[in-house]
């Protein structure tokens, strides 16, 4: 059963004018998809909103609580009683080192990606992290484990985390903004986005640009409405396949996300036009399945593929 922690204030609902971003956040939580949010310069409410991701995250199951408490204990940390059922939400500073992110040290302690196990790792202003730190995320995002070695001793820690990143669209932050003028050169934009690399971005199923025209989402959602959609979507996924959509492996995607000719045609056409990778092709299918689950729809048709493509925005620099 999908349950949420009680919320005693309405600060989430008070951040108006962010209906599209709120929906994108709920979509990410519903299917446990990794998400990249491209921010709008000067709109500080977006920074406040992404810090409220925990309000959308369901409680930990008892089994999940055991593994989380065990990892935190290895790090010499203790989760207080009122935190036991809450999903970990880690947001390290941009100066975080590889050791701090992935773990290490004399006694091989877990790092941020393991402390975020069964929860979320939020990298705000991700472009300000070291390139080496960002690239280290690729393997644990795939394997859900991290293996550390020191002095001939190897230790593995679970790191099944959901990744959320925010970034400006360019060094000056104005690219794509209808109300501002971007002063960046094409070369500076290229250097800016190359910090992420194509392999890392391929592991991000949702790329949401708050500067783009999101007219397909024209509603101001409340926290209770989004929680209801998340609960509905996750319940359906667990009943159908025993896991959330982002966790489906290649052989399960075709089994649980069958596409009719119309939907397949829309997706194939988009792939031919944009040159999306095979991994992003599958990501679109998974996000479309989650969108349908949020709306209580059984089959993924062409319309849901089109909606999912809206959540895979074109980046300022194409790899």
Positions of the model-derived regions?
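Conserved alpha-helical scaffold flanking the Walker A/P-loop in AAA+ ATPase domains
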Residues: 26-28, 83, 88, 99-121
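Conserved Walker B
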Residues: 119, 125-129
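Conserved P-loop NTPase mechanochemical-coupling segment
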Residues: 60-66, 74-100
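Basic, amphipathic alpha-helical bundle interface domains used for macromolecular binding and assembly
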Residues: 107-108, 131-319
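Phosphate-binding P-loop
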Residues: 4-5, 17-18, 26-32, 41, ...
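Conserved RecA-like P-loop NTPase ATPase core
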Residues: 25, 50, 65, 101, ...
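Dynamic helix-loop-helix/coil hinge segments at AAA+ ATPase domain boundaries and subdomain interfaces
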Residues: 2-22, 59
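Walker A/P-loop
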Residues: 30, 35-78
